[in-house]
Structure formats: C-alpha cells, structure tokens
Curated annotation (Swiss-Prot):
One GO CC annotation: chloroplast
Lineage: Eukaryota, Haptista, Haptophyta, Prymnesiophyceae, Isochrysidales
Free-text function comment from the UniProt entry: This protein binds specifically to 23S rRNA.
Keywords on record: Chloroplast, Plastid, Ribonucleoprotein, Ribosomal protein, RNA-binding, rRNA-binding
GO molecular function, one term: rRNA binding
Name of the featured protein: Large ribosomal subunit protein uL22c
Record-linked Gene3D superfamilies: Ribosomal protein L22/L17
UniProt keyword Oxidoreductase present: no
Subunit structure: Part of the 50S ribosomal subunit.
Xref: SUPFAM superfamilies: Ribosomal protein L22
One Pfam entry name: Ribosomal_L22
Record's subcellular location: Plastid, Chloroplast
Length: 117
C-alpha cells in the first residue's frame, strides 16, 4: 500500500518479514480494526496470542508517525485498516528415520496498520 492510496488524514506503519503465519496475525487484527488507539492497546495487552507483540510495535509506530509527521492528537486516533499479507516462506528440512527428510515450512507475514482521525 503506497502513500498515494492513503486518505489525507491517515498515516501507516508496516512491519515486514515477521516470523509468524499471516492467519495467526489476522485473527488478532480483525479484533482491533475500527477501535480507538487506547482501546486497541488495552485489548492487545491482555489477549493471549503471540502475535500481539509485533502488532503492538506496529501500532505504536503508526501512532508515532501520526503524532510526529502530521501533528495529530493520539487520543483521537482510530485504526482505519489493519491487515496482514503473506511474506516469503522459509523451507527447512528435518531428518527422519531411514534417511528420509520432512520439509518444515516457516511462514512470514507483513503487518500493515493504518490510523487516522
């Protein structure tokens, strides 16, 4: 998503190559879309998912971008869009019995959060 696709009152932050499957990240992003910054941060602090940590980092970065670059008040910011795209998949091999090898897939994802007033 380029800056030209953003509305005038929106800003974004992206974390790329996060070592987590995109479906596991989307499960949390669906819950915070449309919520205010403080409400989403409170929700992310107490959700029991591992994907909350990188999402909190991206959310704080998006809010810092809005505050520093555009001068917005952080109390009025709302999460407009939040999505996770699939990144490259790292392929590893696990040795098994009798000379066999099983393929292990380690997915990555790109997390994007758009905030606006």
């Amino acid at each position: 998503m380029s800056k030209t696709l953003l509305q005038e009152n929106e800003t974004m932050a992206v974390a790329r190559y996060v070592r987590m499957g995109p479906n596991k990240v989307r499960r949390v992003l669906r819950q915070i879309t449309g919520k205010s910054y403080s409400e989403a941060l409170l929700l992310l602090e107490f959700l029991p998912y591992k994907s909350c940590d990188p999402i909190i980092k991206v959310l704080r970065s998006a809010v810092a971008n809005a505050k520093n670059n555009l001068g917005y008040d952080t109390t009025k910011l709302v999460i407009k869009k939040a999505f996770a795209d699939q990144g490259p998949v790292m392929k590893r091999f696990r040795p098994r019995a009798q000379g066999r090898a099983y393929r292990i897939l380690k997915p990555t994802s790109h997390i994007t959060i758009v905030v606006g007033s």
